[in-house]
């Protein structure tokens, strides 16, 4: 049978959604256990009046919780995207969609993405295109991705570990930073450069800022492992499939832990989205104290999004309660006050941060 690239890309998106929902795809330690916020025994603020609102790329959001890129590109993903969008609209959150490549290859799938603007007419929405696809198709594809969801910004994702271990992976990264720079110069909306689970170093952050990126989403190691996802996806019936499965398992530990990546990137510029293994409002508070502007969650929201609007809303409310309580106990009445919250960093995370900052 002839290889059908359009159908294959769409099928892969459904595979990813199913695997993330059904399998154990989290790997590693993002470093939050090594971060301890200093308790403020006299917080001098009213917990009931704590303000979670924040500004990001010229937009006011009701909370720093960002619904991270997850899905789209197959008819079976439309309902989840619609539910996530309704929650983003209801709670005043920013939201990113999954890679729009499938819908750009096959416009019949565009409604699996455009539904987010239908359901969230006022939300801050972020389009999504891979760096390789940007290099191959240029700003024209980026423009189509933006138009598809009426996006307020576009994320260019870096997923070269995933590409390296999937059978249909794009194996050349040559020219991607130049393509990002060209897009930043041409587009009228902000460009966000995002990793997808391996983190961003200070060196790469500086390349992104120099290229004109408006923000960086660190996508650190310690949350959903796309190496693990591809390992589950690999066909184990033949030698190549077994080899790819082993490769995915071997690289499950590859990457920069989220806390370390956040510290590195926040020291080079802003704004920064922290993501990768953030599982609670307490983790969010730690990220804000470390310099994050927004905190992205994907897997913790995907699972309730596959259940019901009520389950998803309950999860968001719990996260917000945890964040408010954490801020109160740090004496922070507003999000910007968390920048002044003291914290201790211990263990392996401290060691990695110290090793990355030689005297």
UniProtKB/Swiss-Prot annotation:
A GO molecular-function annotation: isopentenyl-diphosphate delta-isomerase activity
Keywords on record: Cytoplasm, Flavoprotein, FMN, Isomerase, Isoprene biosynthesis, Magnesium, Metal-binding, NADP
Enzyme type, top EC level: isomerase
Binding site for FMN: 68-71, 99, 128, 194, 224, 277-279, 298-299
Reactions the enzyme catalyzes: isopentenyl diphosphate = dimethylallyl diphosphate
Positions that bind Mg(2+): 163
Pfam families, alphabetized: FMN_dh
EC code: 5.3.3.2
Cofactors named for this entry: FMN; NADPH; Mg(2+)
Subcellular localization(s) per the UniProt record: Cytoplasm
InterPro entries cross-referenced by the UniProt entry: Aldolase_TIM, FMN-dep_DH, IPdP_isomerase
One GO location term (cellular component): cytoplasm
Residues reported to bind substrate: 12-13, 99-101, 162
Job of this protein: Involved in the biosynthesis of isoprenoids. Catalyzes the 1,3-allylic rearrangement of the homoallylic substrate isopentenyl (IPP) to its allylic isomer, dimethylallyl diphosphate (DMAPP).
Protein name as it appears in the record: Isopentenyl-diphosphate delta-isomerase
Organism of origin: Methanoregula boonei (strain DSM 21154 / JCM 14090 / 6A8)
Recorded name of the encoding gene: fni
């Amino acid at each position: 049978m002839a290889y059908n690239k359009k159908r294959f890309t769409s099928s892969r998106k459904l595979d990813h959604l199913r695997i993330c929902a059904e399998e154990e795809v989290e790997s590693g330690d993002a470093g939050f256990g090594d971060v301890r916020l200093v308790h403020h025994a006299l917080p001098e603020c009213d917990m009931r009046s704590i303000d979670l609102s924040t500004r990001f790329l010229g937009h006011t959001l009701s909370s720093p919780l960002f619904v991270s890129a997850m899905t789209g590109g197959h008819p079976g993903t439309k309902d989840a995207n619609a539910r996530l969008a309704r929650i983003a609209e209801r709670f005043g959150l920013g939201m990113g969609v999954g890679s729009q490549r499938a819908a750009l290859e096959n416009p019949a799938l565009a409604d699996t993405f455009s539904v987010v603007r239908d359901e969230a007419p006022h939300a801050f929405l972020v389009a999504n295109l891979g760096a390789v696809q940007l290099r191959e198709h240029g700003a024209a594809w980026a423009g189509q991705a933006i138009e598809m969801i009426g996006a307020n910004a576009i994320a260019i994702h870096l997923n070269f570990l995933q590409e390296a271990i999937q059978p249909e992976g794009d194996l050349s990264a040559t020219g991607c930073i130049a393509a990002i720079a060209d897009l930043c110069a041409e587009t009228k909306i902000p460009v966000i450069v995002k990793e997808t689970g391996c983190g961003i170093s200070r060196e790469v952050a500086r390349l992104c800022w120099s290229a004109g990126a408006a923000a960086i989403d660190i996508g650190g190691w310690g949350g959903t492992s796309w190496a693990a996802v591809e390992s589950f996806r690999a066909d184990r019936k033949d030698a190549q499939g077994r080899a790819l499965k082993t490769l995915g398992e071997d690289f499950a530990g590859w990457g920069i832990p989220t806390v370390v990546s956040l510290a590195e990137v926040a020291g080079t510029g802003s704004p920064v989205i922290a993501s990768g293994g953030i599982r609670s409002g307490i983790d969010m508070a730690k990220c804000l104290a470390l310099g994050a502007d927004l905190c992205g969650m994907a897997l913790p929201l995907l699972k309730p999004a596959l259940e019901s609007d009520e389950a998803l809303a309950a999860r968001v409310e719990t996260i917000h309660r945890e964040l408010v309580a954490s801020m109160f106990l740090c004496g922070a009445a507003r999000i910007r006050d968390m920048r002044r919250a003291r914290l201790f960093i211990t263990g392996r995370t401290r060691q990695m941060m110290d090793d990355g900052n030689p005297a």
